[in-house]
Every structure is written in C-alpha cells, then in structure tokens.
C-alpha cells in the first residue's frame, strides 16, 4: 500500500515569505461557499495538487501489509508520482458497495485495485476495533446556498465506504511514520489523544 502526500516543503522554504504567511494563517478556513487558503491557490490547486497525468513531487510511505493487517515492512522516501486518474468519493463508494459498475467499465484496472483497497480497509478497521478503537460516525451538515447567498437547504453529508477507506489508509501511514521515528529515537512531534476517562467510557456503554 502506498500513501503519497504532496511535498509542499519543496516549494515553501523555511523562513520564506510564503512560510511566514502560512505560519500567520495557521490553517485553511473552510466556509460554506468559499475557502480561505493557508497557501496561494497556485500552489494548493496547482503544482502541489496531485492532478492526474502530470508528475508531482511527493512524500511517500510504502507499506507491505499481510492478510491480518500487520505491517511486514515499510519505506519512507521522497518521490515523483504520476497519478492515473481523479476519482470522486461517490463513484468509488458506488463501486465498492456494488451499486454502480460504471467505474469498472471505464477503468477496469483501477477498479480492481480499488476492490483490493476496499478489502484491505475492512481488515484494518476490524483490527483497529479489536485494539479498542471507538468509531464516532457523526453526520456533518451540508449547507446549500441560493444565488443570493442565503441558506436554501441543509443536507446531511453521508460518510460512505470511500471516506472510511481513506481514513484507514491515512491512519496506517501516520502510525507507520510515528513508529519509524520512535524506534530511531529522534525528536519528533506526535499528535495523540489522551486515554479516555473510565467513567465517561461507562456512560457511553
């Protein structure tokens, strides 16, 4: 399994004007009808976007995973990737849920890979459950605006199998990188959750 993240640091050098502005902003802000980006759109939507059919600089984590979801071997490296297709969550979910085979007819090789990825995501999820992971399946509201910018409807965003697949693979990549640096005994920033309060766990149960 390969997880590839755009190598933004190649273009945004430490101490540069772009770096200072990004530090000042802290993060991108997602509003109802627009995004206030942390970085210029020419970067985030251009050379740092993993668009299909073009070479892009990336940071990659390749993981060899067995049938039980255990990582046998891994490699972390700088890479140049050439994406084959731009996929959308709805179409991938339809394929994996057996609702629509249009993606399979159009891109059979990609569809076969997605089926394997879906199987692996299921294995990883079940393994995570056995470790005591709690699944919070919150439905986020999707606010629809009319032409005048006023709220016309509120829909519930459905979290489907494609969303969960990405979550599992990103979790695995993050855990792999964290463990890699842990064993190297190098200074590293870890983003972790504190252990839950036992009384609160009992309330949830």
Task: Label the model's feature ranges.
Residues 1-205:
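Conserved, carboxylate-rich catalytic/transport cores that coordinate ions
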């Amino acid at each position: 399994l390969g997880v590839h993240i755009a190598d933004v640091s190649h273009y945004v050098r430490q101490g540069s004007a772009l770096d200072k502005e990004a530090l000042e902003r802290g993060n991108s802000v997602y509003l109802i009808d627009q995004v206030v980006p942390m970085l210029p759109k020419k970067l985030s939507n251009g050379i740092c976007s993993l668009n299909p059919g073009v070479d892009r600089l990336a940071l990659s984590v390749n993981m060899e995973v067995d049938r039980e979801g255990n990582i046998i071997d891994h490699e972390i490296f700088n890479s140049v990737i050439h994406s084959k297709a731009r996929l959308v969550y709805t179409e991938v979910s339809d394929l994996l849920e057996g609702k629509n085979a249009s993606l399979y007819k159009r891109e059979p090789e990609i569809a076969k890979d997605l089926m394997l990825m879906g199987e692996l995501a299921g294995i990883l999820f079940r393994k995570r459950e056995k470790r005591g992971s709690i699944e919070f399946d919150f439905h986020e509201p999707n606010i629809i605006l009319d032409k005048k910018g006023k709220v016309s409807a509120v829909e519930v965003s459905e979290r489907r199998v494609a969303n969960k697949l990405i979550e599992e693979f990103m979790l695995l990549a993050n855990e792999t990188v964290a463990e890699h640096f842990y064993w190297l005994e190098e200074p590293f920033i870890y983003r972790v959750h504190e252990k839950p309060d036992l009384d609160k766990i009992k309330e949830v149960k």
